[in-house]
Amino acid sequence: MIYILHTPTMSSNTPYATSIVYMWNFKPNERAGIPMACIQQNKQHIPEHTIVTPADIIPILSSFPGLPELWAKIPSHHWVVKADLGRLLYIYKHGGLYLDMDCVIATNPFQQVNPKSDRMILFTEFTVPIDALGPRECKNPRNALRIANYAFAANYKRHPFLEMCIRECMRRLEVLFQSNLDKWAETDILWVCGPDVITTMYHEQASDATETDSSIRLIDRGYLRHLGYGSWRDE
């Protein structure tokens, strides 16, 4: 598959950690208030934060032809798919650090990176047996190492890796819509725009020495604690 990547917009020596991006109100008719416990804990490391809602994502969709139509077709009860895709879009458009609302910074990881060379930060999630992967997920042995989508950062706008991920989400959405499934399984949801996208795209670019993006830094998950509430599974 060929991806046409935009030239990134850089700002020299831009730090990652001036503010944390969280997302809320993607669940239709959300009645719960914004959970502040993790936000307050994370202020010890990064004081500022931004709460992103669907209204912040809509204007970005037109950056990718065909995406507004795909977005509109995502069933409302699968709102987590929009949240998964929305986080990629927002950091692609604006740069910055994304964290799930239930993710706590244990130790500031940005003390270990060089903002001049480590332009995209990803975190390991866990390692699984290949036979534990979902039916649609790539079974290449390298994909046993899963990459988190609950935390990632880019210190410039329009990072090519995020564009690759967004375009892969679009391709996968088209596959699901063309399948005319009566119901999307949990494995479909995790695959279509969830952590399997970042995992697959990371390993694909890292497996070819001629295509490896040296600006991507993979960091151990030990810097974070993901509480993994997974409220979308209750839908």
Where are the regions a protein language model picked out?
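Glycosyltransferase-associated regions of secretory-pathway enzymes
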Residues: 1-83, 99-235
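Small-residue hinge/turn detector
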Residues: 84-96
